Design a protein with these regions (language model features):
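Glycine- and small/polar-enriched repetitive beta-structure motifs of secreted/surface proteins
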Residues: 1-325, 333, 339
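Glycine-rich, low-complexity segments
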Residues: 340-346
Length: 346
């Protein structure tokens, strides 16, 4: 009903998740208000638009199966050799509001997905979208209903891939930008709320990740921020790493903060500041008591650390720094500057 199909359609063979039989596929592709322009492209989705050659928007709907008419509602392809694959997807809201611009891109069992570029794939990025089953009294009413449905479902799977060769599988509300980045989750344990940007980054089973750079590897991590290259975070949460590493360095502790080139943190909650710094001292370190020339026996927080140390160097490799421009301390746990020590001597 109300559909338009322009171009030659004589191809028979595999296209996306469908085996194309030209006559049958062409007939099934005449969905409500769908638009197809291009050679051997096929569109099975209400209000879907397909422009270019050898694209397919696939569904199992043939006018009689009521489980499939919502599939691919409002989906869009502009380019060639792209596929929005919903025919073999189990979810009847697969393909809803998917958009592809470019060449040789693919979505499968996903909705609310956006792809721009070439050779990108988004699979199994899907949540329920309460797409309308009737058009309402006007196009404006239908559009308003769709906007509300998308908003209430947080955009569906809402995964975006911009660039080339990016892959996302079992992700939600995730943006993948650049070249050859991969983000994966699992059924029922999707990787969600992530931003991965750069080249050759890999993330698996992550939540609330921000990774910007190249050749970073993150797995089983939450609330992690990486800006740099050659960093690896495994089974650790709340890490903040800013700065690149010449060779891959690994953080496996929670709450690590590493800022600078070639910085490393090996203790939970440790902080490494400055190029080449390593944080290796854990909480529980006891201060030296000058009155007894021995470690203090006082276990209060004044004498015994309750969190891991802040390192500004690496004494094992003769990397040491001064801390300059320090005001005189006031409280028992404040730093003392040289001026105060001179007063003690006087």
């Amino acid at each position: 009903t109300g559909s338009t199909m322009i171009g030659s359609h004589n191809y028979k063979g595999e296209l996306g998740d469908t085996t194309v039989d030209t006559a049958t596929t062409r007939k099934d592709a005449l969905n409500a208000y769908a638009t197809t322009v291009g050679a051997n492209s096929f569109t099975n989705g209400a209000f879907a638009t397909n422009t270019g050659a050898y694209n397919i928007i696939s569904s199992g709907y043939n006018g009689g199966r009521m489980a499939n008419p919502v599939k691919n509602l409002g989906s869009t392809i502009n380019g060639s050799l792209n596929s929005i694959e919903s025919k073999t997807a189990n979810n009847y809201y697969s393909g809803v509001a998917n958009s592809i611009v470019g060449t040789a891109n693919r979505t499968f069992n996903s909705n609310g997905s956006i792809i721009m570029g070439a050779g990108n794939e988004i699979t199994n990025s899907i949540t329920y979208i309460s797409a309308p089953t009737t058009g309402g009294s006007s196009p404006n009413e239908l559009a308003s209903t769709l906007r509300t449905a998308v908003k209430n479902s947080n955009g569906g799977g809402a995964t975006m891939a911009f660039g080339g060769g990016n892959k996302a599988d079992y992700t939600l509300r995730t943006s993948v930008i650049g070249i050859n980045n991969t983000v994966t989750g699992a059924s029922g344990a999707e990787s969600a709320d992530n931003l991965v940007m750069g080249v050759g980054n890999t993330a698996a089973n992550v939540q609330h990740l921000t990774a910007i750079g190249s050749k970073n590897t993150i797995s089983d991590a939450k609330n992690t921020v990486i800006v740099g290259d050659n960093r690896k975070v495994t089974s650790a949460n709340n890490a903040v790493i800013i700065g690149s590493s010449d060779a891959e360095t690994t953080a496996t502790v929670n709450d690590a903060v590493a800022i600078g080139h070639n910085t490393e943190v090996s203790k939970e909650g440790g902080v490494a500041l400055g190029s080449g710094s390593k944080a290796t001292v854990a909480a529980g370190a006891v201060g030296y008591d000058i009155s007894t020339n021995a470690p203090s026996t006082d276990t209060s927080a004044t004498w015994k650390s309750t969190a891991s140390a802040v390192s500004i160097g690496d004494v094992a490799n003769d990397v040491t720094r001064q801390i300059t421009s320090v005001a005189a301390g006031t409280n028992d746990t404040d730093a003392v500057n040289v001026s105060q020590l001179k007063r003690v001597q006087d």
